[in-house]
Amino acid sequence: MWSDSLVSRICVPIIVVCTSIALLNVVSFRSECSCVVHISGAAIDIRGCSFTPDFIEYAKTLRVFNHRYQE
C-alpha cells in the first residue's frame, strides 16, 4: 500500500509543475493577444493593437456601420 508520505512526495511536485505550466501558458497567451477592431452601428472598439503610425492612419479611415437606407 502507498503511504501518505510517499503520495505527498509524488503528488505535490506533480501538482506544482502542472499548475506552473498552466500559469505560464496563460501569461504567454495574454502577452501575444492579437489586435481586434470591432465595428458596430454605434461605435468602433480597438483592443490589443500596437498603435504604429501605419495603424493610426488606418484607424482614421474607420467609420461606424450605417445600415439605414440612404436616398
From Swiss-Prot:
Keyword Mitochondrion annotated: no
Entry keyword annotation includes Glycoprotein: no
Lumenal membrane side: 1-4
Name of the protein this chain belongs to: Movement protein TGBp3
Compartments it resides in: Host endoplasmic reticulum membrane
Source organism (scientific name): Poplar mosaic virus (isolate ATCC Pv275) (PMV)
Cytoplasmic side: 28-71
GO cellular component: host cell endoplasmic reticulum membrane; membrane
Lineage of producing organism: Viruses, Riboviria, Orthornavirae, Kitrinoviricota, Alsuviricetes
Main location: host cell
Function of the protein: Plays a role in viral cell-to-cell propagation, by facilitating genome transport to neighboring plant cells through plasmosdesmata. May induce the formation of granular vesicles derived from the Endoplasmic reticulum, which align on actin filaments.
UniProt keyword list: Host endoplasmic reticulum, Host membrane, Membrane, Transmembrane, Transmembrane helix, Transport, Viral movement protein
InterPro entries in the record: TGBp3 (IPR003411)
